[in-house]
UniProtKB/Swiss-Prot annotation:
Recorded superkingdom: Bacteria
Protein species of origin: Streptococcus pneumoniae serotype 2 (strain D39 / NCTC 7466)
Protein name (Swiss-Prot/TrEMBL): Formate--tetrahydrofolate ligase
Pathway it works in: One-carbon metabolism; tetrahydrofolate interconversion
Pfam family, one: FTHFS
Annotated positions binding ATP: 65-72
Length: 556
């Protein structure tokens, strides 16, 4: 079979104007970036707000292998299949970060015959949103350092500045840096560091803001650090929220592209789910709900991270809650969660599938806690065997969860028809009764304990001394009614990436709590989660190239 990029380059794209015409979007509603990419104007976004709200399908997954389990591929393939069976459907997904594209992933626009196109553009610079977010973030850093240099009227304690610079790359050498060296003309020396752009609070803000005014309000609320008297300093205190919003004025508008089968897709925003809330923009999802009868969206990593955050953080900002949740499972991930070594995942092992099913079962139970019906999608791989598939279907039947095999990677829309029909039937026969996991009025400790004990199934939460001090500070400043955004490994329910399957009786340690007032949540850091990833021993970048005619090589 052709590679992803060979498939993508073999497709004759339709002009984006023609793709979105069936949604009632005209040429005048678009801000074009060439023939195949566009942003949707705010005038059109506001015009469709009075339209009925369609059905929302959330795609999540079991705890993944390092290569991922194909959530984006399944999301795209399911939407194509829904359109194939006559359902007016849109996609709303995140845009890739260049760091992982150059690192381990090599691309993040779906795969096989379930891709959003033009995949080369989407995986690289797209419409420039990532660069705008990077620039806004670093402009704030420059303005903070300039304030210190020009007399520090606000009394900012340079030892307690929370705000870091960012770059959209995996670069471990930048995690800890010192700025302001070289004498009095070069600023005030202080410790600083870089995060990856998708970990920036500005990325989270962009994905939760509903318009320019809300964007400015959220930007003004960012806490950049503390004064010498330990009181917080915000972007509003610096009076630069307008300048930051100006940099982001186009980035906030959702991007429109198409799938291989011509399904219209919003690809907008890209926070990670292990260090942020892991969902595409509220604006894109909300607008899709007003334009289509069905919207298919996804949340990053496993359901313990992305789906929990989608349901507890993003959903309250949407006009509706998910009508169904599709949990993507692969036999290789089930076998890994069942104790099989990574180099043996392609070998048949029915007993490992049985053992790893405990992981999938827990995710199904967790989704049901939110009052939403679950459907399991088996993302088919060539190494899957009939015996393994049969036992997984048998196990799903034992907990009364619908399950369908999906071959959208190899077969495109046709390979997702059975899944699409099952999802539509599930929505029709099992109306959702959404409820959040916790009430925001609970204490910070109680909210974290709810997530740990009810979603992860841990037995206890330990708060390190630093986090205890930060909780007291959060309460003192009146921030304790915000939801919690857990920063945790994606590979395990616990904070230990090696504790696979469905671990029990484990304790989770909270080492730090970071207020993200602009985004509207508090990040609870566990384990060794890094906000600036590093590159692997053999980065995907080593296989990338561009030919003299501009043809891109090596993305996948």
């Amino acid at each position: 079979m052709k590679t992803d990029i060979e498939i993508a380059q073999s497709i004759e794209l339709k002009p984006i104007v023609d793709v979105v015409e069936k949604l009632g979007i005209s040429y005048d509603d678009l801000e074009l970036y060439g023939k195949y990419k566009a942003k949707l104007s705010f005038d059109k976004i506001r015009a469709v707000e009075s339209n009925p709200v369609g059905k929302l399908i959330l795609v999540t997954a079991i705890n993944p292998t390092p290569a991922g389990e194909g959530k984006s591929t399944l999301t795209i393939g399911l939407a194509d299949a829904l359109n194939k069976i006559g359902k007016k459907t849109m996609i709303a997904i995140r845009e890739p970060s260049l760091g992982p594209v150059m690192g381990i992933k090599g691309g993040a626009a779906g795969g096989g015959y379930a891709q959003v196109l033009p995949m080369e553009d989407i995986n690289l610079h797209f419409t420039g949103d990532m660069h705008a977010i990077t620039t806004a973030n670093n402009a704030l850093s420059a303005l903070i350092d300039n304030h210190l240099h020009q007399g520090n009227e606000l009394g900012i304690d340079q030892r307690r500045i929370l705000w870091k610079r960012v770059v959209d790359l995996n670069d471990r050498a930048l995690r800890h840096v010192t700025v302001g060296l070289g004498g009095p003309l070069n600023g005030i020396p202080r410790e600083d560091g870089f995060d990856i752009t998708v970990a920036s609070e500005i990325m989270a803000i962009l994905c939760l803001a509903t318009d320019i005014e809300d964007l400015k309000r959220r930007l003004a609320n960012i806490v950049i650090g503390y004064r010498y008297d330990r009181t917080p300093v915000s972007v509003g205190d610096l009076q630069v929220e307008g300048a930051l919003a100006l940099i982001l004025k186009d980035a906030i508008k959702p991007n429109l592209v198409q799938t291989i089968y011509g399904t219209p897709a919003f690809v907008h925003g890209g926070p990670f789910a292990n260090i942020a809330h892991g969902c595409n923009s509220v604006l894109a999802t909300t607008t899709a709900l007003h334009l289509a009868d069905y919207t298919v969206t996804e949340a990053g990593f496993g359901a313990d991270l992305g789906a929990e955050k989608f349901l507890d953080i993003k959903t309250p900002n949407l006009p509706t809650s998910p009508d169904a949740v599709v949990i993507v499972a692969t036999l290789r991930a089930l076998k890994m969660n069942g104790g099989v070594a990574k180099d043996a995942l392609t070998e048949e092992n029915v007993e490992a599938v049985r053992a790893g099913f405990a992981n999938l079962k827990r995710h199904v139970e967790n989704i049901r806690k939110f009052g939403i019906p679950a459907v399991v999608a088996i993302n088919e791989f060539v190494s899957d065997t009939e015996a393994e598939i049969a036992v997984l279907k048998e196990l799903c039947a034992s907990i009364d969860v619908p399950v369908e095999l999906a071959s959208v990677w190899a077969d495109g829309a046709e390979g997702g028809v059975a899944l699409a029909e099952t999802v539509v039937k599930t929505i029709a026969e099992n109306p959702a009764n959404y409820k959040r996991l916790y009430d925001n009025d609970l204490s910070v400790q109680e909210k974290i304990e709810k997530i740990v004990t009810e979603i992860y199934r841990g037995s206890k939460v330990n708060f390190e001394k630093k986090s205890q001090t930060q909780i007291a500070q959060i309460v003192q400043n009146g921030w304790d009614k915000l939801p919690i955004c857990m920063a945790k490994t994606q590979y395990s329910f616990s904070d230990n990436p090696n504790a696979l399957g469905a671990p029990e009786n484990f304790e989770i340690t909270i080492r730090e709590l970071v207020p993200k007032l602009g985004a509207g949540f508090i990040v609870a850091l566990t384990g060794d989660v890094m906000t600036m990833p590093g590159l692997p021993k053999r980065p995907a970048a080593l296989n990338m190239d561009v030919e003299s005619d501009g043809t891109v090589l090596g993305l996948f």
